[in-house]
Amino acid sequence: FNYDASETLFGDRDRIVSAEIRGGYGKFMGRIPRVWYGNAYSRSGGLSDYVKVYGHDSTLPSFRCGGTVGPMPAGDPSFFWMGASSNYCIPSSPYFNDAQVTDPDFEAPQSWRGNLALDLVTAGGYKLTLEYNHDSVDQAVFYKELGLTRESIMADGRGVYSHGPGDFMLTNTGEGGAKATSFSVQKSFDNGLSMFGSWSSVSAEDVYPLTSAQAESAYGYTQRWDGENVPAARSSFMADSKIVVGLEYRTMLFGDNETRVSAIYINKSGEPYSITFDNSSYSPIGGTGYSAFRDDYSLAYIPTDANDPKVVFTSASVATDVMNHINNGPLAKYKGTYAPRNAFENPDYDRLDVRITQEIPSFMEGHKFLFYLDLLNVMNMLDDEQGRIFEYGYNTSRQIIADAMDDGRFEIKGVDPDDSLYLQDNDGQSRWQIQMGLKYRF
C-alpha cells in the first residue's frame, strides 16, 4: 500500500513538503536450486559404484568393487543410469551405498515478509527514508540423517551419535527469520554537489547455511552442539550494521564538457563465526567412528577454570594458556557451557573508492570522448594495513584443540587463537587497484 500522509502528519509544518507511508505483507518464495532435489537421484541407494562405471584409463582399479573402472562412454551420459550390469555392485564400504531422499511433504523455502516505510521530502530538498523489514520463515530447508542414533552423553550434556551409511532426507523446518532497520538521506545542491548516506542494522537467523551442493556436506559443515538439535542461530551471511556514504561533484572546467568526481565509502561489521573444537584425532566430538558430522564443527565447551571436572588438560601449561585465552576474550561469558553458533564477529571492514571522469570534445558534433580513472580501495593505497578483509574460513574458528575421552570428558591439548583466520583476497577485495580507460560516445 501507499498512503500520502503529508496533510495527516505534517499539515501544519512548512518544513515537510511531502510524506508517504508505504508497506506490504505477503508470502514469498524464490527459485529452488535443483541440486537439492538432485541428491535423491545421484545417491539413490542402488548398486552403482561411481568409481567403477567410468574412467579415463580402463586399467585403473575400482577400489570399491574390485576389477577395473572401465572406459567412459564418450558423449553418452546415459551410462550413469543405464550401464551394463557388470558395472554395478554392492560396494564393500558404505561410502557410496547411501540413499538420499526427499521428504514427500517437502515444500520449497518460503517466508512471510512485511515492510513499513516512511518517505519524507523536506523544504530544503532532503529526501529521507526510514524503513523496517520483517521476515518470518514459513518453510526452510532441514536435513536429517536417517540412521542417527544416540549412544551416550558427554560431560557437558551433548549426545554422542552413531549413524548408518549416511542416508540423508531433505525436509523442512519452520525456524528462522530476519529483522532489518534502515535509514537513508540524499540531497542535491545547486553548486553541483550531491550526497547520499545510509545506515542499516540487520538481525537474521537460519538453521542450515546451505553452502554446499551435496546433502552430506550441507549437513556436516554446519556447526552444532548436539546432533540434530540445531536451532536457528545468527546467519553466517549477515552484517549487524552497515554504513554507506556517497559524494559526487559535477562541474564544467572548459566548455560544455562535464568533469565529475565521485567517492563512495563503506563500513560494515564482519560476518559472524563460531568457535569450535579442533579435533586432533580427526574424529568429530559428538560422533562415533565414521560420522555424518564433520571434524572440527563441534561447538566448543568452554571450561570454567583449570579444575573444571568436565575437562582434562594435558598439562598445567596447557591449562594456563587455554584459560588465559578464554578469560581475556569473548569466550569468558560462556564459561561452563558452549559458545552458540555464530556468536562472534569477524573484524569490521572499511573501503573507499573514487572515480574521476572527464568529457573531451570530439571533431564531430554530438560526439565526445570520456576519460575515466578509478581508484579502488583508497584506504589500502594509503596504508597497506587498512582496507583488508579478514574472515574465518567457513565461519568457523577451531580454537580449542581437544578430543573426546571414553568417560565423556574433553581432553584439551592446546589453543589456537586465530585458527582459520584468512585474508580474503580472491577477487582483489583486500588490495588497492587503479584502472583507467577511454570511451567514445556518439
How would you label these PLM feature ranges?
Residues 1, 19-21, 102, 112-116, ...:
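Hydrophobic, lipid-facing positions within transmembrane beta-strands of outer-membrane proteins
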Residues 1-5, 27, 120, 187, ...:
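Residue-level signature of outer-membrane beta-barrel architecture
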Residues 2-169, 289-292, 347:
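Solvent-exposed loop/turn elements at secondary-structure boundaries
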Residues 3, 25-31, 134-138, 201-205, ...:
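Transmembrane beta-strands of outer-membrane beta-barrel pores
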Residues 4-19, 124-125, 190-192, 252-261, ...:
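Short loop/turn motifs that connect adjacent beta-strands in outer-membrane beta-barrel proteins
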Residues 21-23, 118, 130, 185, ...:
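Membrane-embedded beta-strand positions of outer-membrane beta-barrel proteins
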Residues 86, 260-363, 370, 395-422:
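Extracytoplasmic gating/loop element in the C-terminal half of outer-membrane beta-barrel translocons
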Residues 129-274:
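Gram-negative outer-membrane beta-barrel transporters
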